[in-house]
């Protein structure tokens, strides 16, 4: 006999957990949260995300999502460990045009409530990021409240809140294989462990969203795309930050090098480099491995060394100490991209079937809050029209167009200033 509940959330990454958390805050109970992977490192994008949170965004909606996410994560802890490290975020400028553009970002930040943002000198950058060569930059754009999230720990903290309130239950290793739909109304889901019934179902499966959409005969227009991350050998002077757990203890500021589509973050006693400066590599949801078939996790694929050569050279140029270190871990992780870079939120064409996908860690807290308000009250507090799933026209769902725009958005994810 199928289990009945008030709502089923498919996907227990940070977006699904955030929505459940905020629904519980609004008094909802009898929630079921399902995931195909093991709890709570389920194998999706949340499980390997670098955790960097840069709040500044030309979209007011996205900027507000990020600001709320920082506030939320700073309020959370799990087993005595924080879910956010407020180390600050710095975008450095290699060129004069980039440095001029930082002032545009500063204006955006101030108008959207990031009033502590400011432009800083190369020497000030050096104080917060001691491995950078200050002679290579014109300065930096600094937001003190930016920082580093511990994504899996945040999921654990929010899930604990939900279960402690007896507001919902989380079930891992439970793959959704189909949807029950009658007269265009969602009635439940079919899973590898039986059927679940509910008149509200939220899909928050990230890179698997297109596959979930096809199971329900709707389009969730995003593309999974590979993204490179590497870990360096440890730095002796950072040994005090070495930890016996996966989430990082950090002190150095989160760094972004917009002119080469790179970011850098301290990770315990070493550094991680993230690279967007490579050919976009688009996948289909159906190509992704099942959790039980993946060597480490299904959201990771083989690293491509050729794609990293230019990024490696540029990183060593900007951070000379990096040239002394070998690469100890290399991954191509998979994240979601849409045609316009905004998330897929709201009720779909099937009544009661909702989506919250293509959401980064940066915005997950705010998106979860908005989704809960939308489901409970009929509309969220924040204007989220830029993220509404119903914003798309017919051509936006054409696979060729979607892949083309997804590739372009990947190329430009760090390039608010093009052709400099």
Where do the protein language model's features map onto the residues?
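Dinucleotide-binding Rossmann-like beta1-alpha1 core, especially the glycine-rich loop
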Residues: 50-128, 259-264, 282, 299
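Active-site lid/adjacent beta-loop-alpha segment flanking the redox-cofactor pocket in flavoenzymes
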Residues: 235-351
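C-terminal catalytic lobe of FAD-dependent flavoproteins
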Residues: 302-405, 415-416
């Amino acid at each position: 006999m199928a289990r009945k509940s008030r709502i089923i959330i498919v996907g227990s990454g940070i977006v699904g957990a955030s929505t459940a958390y905020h629904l519980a805050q609004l008094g909802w109970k009898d929630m079921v949260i399902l995931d195909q992977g093991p709890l709570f490192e389920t194998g999706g994008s949340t499980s390997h995300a670098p955790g960097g949170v840069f709040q500044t965004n030309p979209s007011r909606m996205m900027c507000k999502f990020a600001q709320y996410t920082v506030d939320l994560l700073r309020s959370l802890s799990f087993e005595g460990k924080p879910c956010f490290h407020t180390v600050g975020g710095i975008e450095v400028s290699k060129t004069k045009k980039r440095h001029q553009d930082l002032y545009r970002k500063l204006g955006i930040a101030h108008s959207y409530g990031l009033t502590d943002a400011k432009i800083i000198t190369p020497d000030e950058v050096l104080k917060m990021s001691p491995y950078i060569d200050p002679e290579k930059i014109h300065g930096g754009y600094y937001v003190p409240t930016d920082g580093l999230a511990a994504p899996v720990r945040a999921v654990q903290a929010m899930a604990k809140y939900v279960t402690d309130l007896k507001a919902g239950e989380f079930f891992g290793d439970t793959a959704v294989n189909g949807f029950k739909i009658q007269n265009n109304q969602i009635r439940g889901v079919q899973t590898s462990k039986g059927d679940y019934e509910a008149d509200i179902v939220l899909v928050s499966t990230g890179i698997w969203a297109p596959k979930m959409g096809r199971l329900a005969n709707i389009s969730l227009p995003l593309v999974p795309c590979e993204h490179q991350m590497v870990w360096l050998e440890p730095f002796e002077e950072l040994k005090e930050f070495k930890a016996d757990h996966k989430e990082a203890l950090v002190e150095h500021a989160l760094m972004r090098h917009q002119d080469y589509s790179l970011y850098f973050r301290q990770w315990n006693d070493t550094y991680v480099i993230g690279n967007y400066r490579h050919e976009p590599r688009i996948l289909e949801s159906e190509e992704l491995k099942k959790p039980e078939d993946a060597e480490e996790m299904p959201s990771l694929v083989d690293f491509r060394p050729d794609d990293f050569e230019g990024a490696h050279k540029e990183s060593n140029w900007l951070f000379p100490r990096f040239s002394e270190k070998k690469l100890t871990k290399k991954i191509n992780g998979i994240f979601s991209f849409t045609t316009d870079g905004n998330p897929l939120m709201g009720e779909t064409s099937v009544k009661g079937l909702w989506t919250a996908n293509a959401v980064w860690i940066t915005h997950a807290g705010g998106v979860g809050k908005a989704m809960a308000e939308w489901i409970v009250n009929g509309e969220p507090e924040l204007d989220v029209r830029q993220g509404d799933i119903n914003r798309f026209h017919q051509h936006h769902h054409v696979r060729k167009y979607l892949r083309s725009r997804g590739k372009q958005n990947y190329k430009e994810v760090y390039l608010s200033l093009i052709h400099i």
